Structures are given as C-alpha cells and as structure tokens.
Amino acid sequence: MPSQRVGIRVEDTELDGVLHLPAARAIGGVAVLHGFGGDPSQPHIVATCDELARAGIAALRFAYRDHQPPRMTLDSGLADAAGAIRLLKAHPDVPERLGVVGFSFGGTVAALVAGRDSRIRGAVLAAAPAAPGPSFTAWSNEGKWKPVAELSRTRARVLLVWGSRDDQVPFENAERYAAVLSQARVPNRIVTIEGGDHDFAPAGPRAKMTETVAGWMREALA
C-alpha cells in the first residue's frame, strides 16, 4: 500500500507522520496512536496501519512531541492527536469519516479524543489504562483527566481490544470502560486476542488483532 510522509502542525512544532493510503479511494481516515515510551515504527503500529489501508481506510501514525517519559503527558498527547485529526480532515484524499485507534497510553488519549470530538465515528482502545497507575507517571499531576467518564459522552462506536497475555494493563480496565459505556448506551464491544501480550506479539496474535481492528473500523466508518 502507498504511504507518504506528512508534517502535523501542533502549536509551534511540526510532528513527523506517515500516512498509509489504500490502493483505491479511502472510505475514511484514522489516527493511530502509540503508547507511552513507544514510537510509531513499532511492529504492532505499522501492522495496524497497513491492515487499515488494505481495508480501504487511510491510517496516520506519528510520533508525539515528547514521547519518552517523563515529559510526555495527557495534555501534550491530546494536543498532538487533535493535530493528527485536523490533518486527516483537511487531506484531499480522505473523506470526513474519522476514527482513532490507540494502544496503551495512546488508547487513553484516544478515549479523550473520542469523548471530545463529535466527528469521531469509531474509537479503538487497545490495552488502554482506565485510570493512572504506577507505570504512568505522566498522569501524576493530571487528575482532571477522567478517560472513562469522557469516553461515555462519545458519539462513536467503541472497540476494546486486549491480549490474553497482557501483564501490564489488566483486563479489568476493559471491563471498567465497557460497564460505563453500556450504562451510557454507547455501542461497545470487547475482543480478547488469545496469546497476545501488551503489544499483541507474537506474529499470530498480532495479525488477528490487526484484522479485528480493521474490519471493525471499516463497519464503524461506513
């Protein structure tokens, strides 16, 4: 699938991004957000973008301004993700059917984006913390952010994806999101990827995850 380098303007900074485009005209566009301390070239991020493009969806991956601890925060991550959504909305090859996919910390950012931006039709939270934990010091002074409550206000459909071998973000986080979403009557679904770890390795579970995410997102954006 073709891809192109893009610059994402956020405040006084330009973020480096890669836009994966389908072979035919896209049905919509999705921002794909990596995790805390990760980067957009990680195998599960690239594989997800490739599979989305094969499903007819333009997929944008990028590096946050401060993507290493301790400088990365939900404030900065949310602003960067909003910049990615703006780029997708303005791109001539991307119809205004928008979604967001986030992994780990990026999933928490995705929850905030989907809760605040009414243009988002589909949101995927993959191994996303529902509340601050010891591994997420970026939240230490950000008690104002309540991702579960904010996501409950979304107009989007929500997919919650977890690996059965994830030893970093317990499955109870998915259940917490789902309980509040269901109470708010937000359409949601939980999918467990058997054998997948926090990054959905090894290759077999990763392929199952990307197929699940891309197929679900295609329906959400239709």
Residue ranges and their predicted role:
Residues 65-92, 203:
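Catalytic nucleophile-loop/oxyanion-hole region of alpha/beta-hydrolase
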Residues 1-25:
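N-terminal cap/lid segment of alpha/beta-hydrolase-fold proteins
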Residues 165-169, 199:
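Acidic catalytic loop of the alpha/beta-hydrolase fold
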Residues 154, 160-162, 166:
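Short beta-strand/loop motif that positions the catalytic acidic residue
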Residues 49-69:
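Conserved alpha/beta-hydrolase
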Residues 71, 196-207:
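Catalytic histidine-centered segment of alpha/beta-hydrolase-like enzymes
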Residues 37-49, 64, 172-173:
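The serine-hydrolase catalytic nucleophile loop
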Residues 84-147:
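Primarily recognizes the serine-hydrolase "nucleophile elbow" in alpha/beta-hydrolase
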